[in-house]
Amino acid sequence: VRALHDGEEIALLLVWHDDTYDRSTVRPQDFRDAVAIEFSLASDPPFFGMGESAKLVNIWMWKSEMQADLASGYQDIEDVYPDMVVDTYPSIVRSPVDQPMGDARTVGLDPTYIAGWGAGNPVSDPTRPEPVEVLQAHGHGTLQARPPIDQTVEANGLYRADTYRVVFRRVLTPMGKKDTGIVRLELGTEVAVAFAVWNGNARDRDGKKNISIWQSIKIAP
């Protein structure tokens, strides 16, 4: 892990070895590669495994399939099963012979009828602009996405020669009032930080991951 800042923004580079490039979650038997940074929001850090009930942690999570979607287009079920059949409701205007047999690609559908996307769930949004999510947690089973206004972290990942390189970038101190769920990296301060890596080929997902204990990041003045 490496980090640097210019007084306004901070960037963190995470590099790790992985024998396989797992970048799809379309099938239920497939799992992604991913990496996350966890920041303690308390000077006395809570349990490093997702925080504690009275102590929030802020998490930045990069996901390989989101990066692949941005590079090559949203991975949909037709990409995995190209010969699938798509049924449509019969039309009272056209005969069955005249009805076009379209596809069911998510990006071409009305979000109203794609429950998660229509409800504003960022995980279900096929048009998401970044391969990273800003999350918070205060103990096991409490992980949730921060509101859209807080999704200000940028990230970019590259897999080459059995190695991942992922860069996270964000302003040191987000504008607006101080929020208890967002880390503020003030100049001259020290913040507890931990890391997690998911290996899709090992069927890692959710709490099955490789984690570190708390480390310390010092924001040089």
Can you name each region flagged by the protein language model?
Residues 27-128, 175-221:
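Acidic/polar low-complexity flexible segments
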Residues 13-23, 172-181:
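Charged, amphipathic alpha-helical segments
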Residues 5-9, 159-164, 184-189:
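A short, structured loop/turn motif at beta-sheet edges
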Residues 1-2, 7-13, 19-23, 32-37:
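N-terminal ectodomain recognition module in secreted, GPI-anchored, and membrane glycoproteins
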Residues 9-16, 164-170:
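Short, well-ordered beta-strand segments enriched in hydrophobic/aromatic residues
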Residues 115-149:
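Surface-exposed, low-complexity/disordered Ser/Thr/Gly/Pro/Asn-rich loops and linkers
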Residues 1-2, 153-158:
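Beta-strand-rich interaction surfaces with strong enrichment in secreted/lumenal proteins
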